């Protein structure tokens, strides 16, 4: 039988690995699902090349952005660029939002400049969640019109709230903002989805997912219990 020390060590490793999870871009489809390199700009370590990446349609008059956050709190910058390598010329597409609570976060209406319709580029999510800036990108075809999320899919976790929150570190990652006015003016963007969305009615693993911390803690307790038998 494994010693109590080895079992506890395995449990602590599980807790550490799970608690350090970052975030997952769910829509549009990300360039990579790998989270270990998310601190690498501009796209979380993924190879950004619009001629090679598989692109998802994103509607310039309004489309949804959905992600899963493994942190208790994080600020999100939604930005876009027509640079074929995602190397620069990033524009802010939505005011910076602070998410409080682990789980799903969905913004149902994100717009981009109308002149981008018919072009390819990248939509990027940059997060400031207390352990450095994290990045994820999606290759997209910017198309005309708008596209609401499929029914019931763009909802926030039951423990998630959101509000607009300035973040100078994230603001420094863009050259201009398509939805923000000039200095001193107010944004015309809609309020964050969390102020109006209803929590997911789906089971936790399908809707908001189980909290990383609670899952890990349960695993550690089971391991310790097994060692004491």
Curated annotation (Swiss-Prot):
Positions of glycan attachment: 156
Binding, Cu(2+): 22, 71, 131
Localization per Swiss-Prot or TrEMBL: Cell membrane
Topology term for the membrane: Lipid-anchor; GPI-anchor
Cofactor binding note from Swiss-Prot or TrEMBL: Binds 1 copper ion per subunit.
Cofactors, names only: Cu(2+)
Region described as Disordered: 173-202
Propeptide: 201-229
Name this protein carries in UniProt: Lytic polysaccharide monooxygenase-like protein X325
Organism of derivation: Podospora anserina (strain S / ATCC MYA-4624 / DSM 980 / FGSC 10383) (Pleurage anserina)
Gene assigned in the entry: X325
